Amino acid sequence: MGRIERAILNLIENEGDVHGAEDLAIEIYNSFPPTRAQTGSVLRAAHALARKQPDKIAEISGKGRDSFWIGAPHEIALYRRWVC
């Protein structure tokens, strides 16, 4: 796993909340607002992490940067019920 993937996994395991791509980029890179490149790299790493560890990480994704959410599977299930 890469540095960004480890940071995402650490945030999700410790905070246990649902995060968006820009929220993760702010936490990982410590910059506000994050650049498009930072948000894109976090988005790619989050997709890769969700594919590698489906038992620990779940995602909701749609079109665009703002519709991506990642978190623990039980948190995503709660978030999906709340949104839909």
What are these regions (language model features)?
Residues M1-L11, P34-A48, K52-C84:
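Phospho-regulated, low-complexity intrinsically disordered regions of nuclear gene-regulatory
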Residues E13-V18, S31-F32:
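Short helix-capping/hinge SLiMs at alpha-helix to coil transitions
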Residues V18-I28:
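Short acidic, hydrophobic short linear motifs in intrinsically disordered regions
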